[in-house]
Amino acid sequence: MRPRAAGFTLIEVLLATMLLVGGLALAFATLRSASAISQRGEAIAQRSERTRAVEEFLRRRLSAALPIAMGIDTQSQQPMLFVGEPQRMRFAADVPDYLGRGGPYLHDVSVVGDGEQRTLTIALTMLQSGKEIEEGNALPAETLADDVQQVSFRYRGLDPQSGALSGWLPQWEWHDRLPLLVRIDIRSGGAAWPPVVVALPQSGGGGALAQ
């Protein structure tokens, strides 16, 4: 019998090649999976960071709300200190210099659009003696959150007639006073944000008008 020649047979080479190709395919699949997981993780982290930033901004602006007149209610003829609707609220608060010229500004927080692609925006307008002052370099409304499916604002405060604490109201009817609490619920990307509940320190329990 002739001895077997040294080296690999064609079958062995083919098997080794198939194993190598299979190993490379598995390695590339693992890399793609890891890359996809990493990208999803980064996207989630960015959304979470954006959510926290928007929540903190809203908390700071609402907690800075002041009992300063933004105009006169045409029905009651009383100064308007706070206007709260299901998807819009308007109030006065001082702003830091990087947001404007300092001093009180009208904050107009509203939901734009409908359906599944709504946008939460804020517009700032200078206030002087209860009147809106248009600035020459006024900034347009800023986007706080886009691609939002649902946004709702609710308000809680003292009923001026009974003096009792109200439940959560979709409409703040007493424009001549600040609510005690404001709640904001946002849903985007198929998930609900943590509810934002803010106490308004300057409400004073009844929102007395600042002189």
From Swiss-Prot:
Protein known as: Type II secretion system protein J
N-methylphenylalanine PTM sites in chain numbering: F8
Bilayer disposition of the protein: Single-pass membrane protein
Principal location class: membrane
Family, similarity comment: Belongs to the GSP J family.
Cross-referenced InterPro entries: N_methyl_site
Subcellular location: Membrane
Keywords: Membrane, Methylation, Protein transport, Transmembrane, Transmembrane helix, Transport
Function (record text): Involved in a type II secretion system (T2SS, formerly general secretion pathway, GSP) for the export of proteins.
NCBIfam families named in the record: PRK08808.1
Membrane spanning residue stretches: 8-28
Residues excised as propeptide: 1-7
Gene: xpsJ
Coiled-coil ranges from the UniProt annotation: none
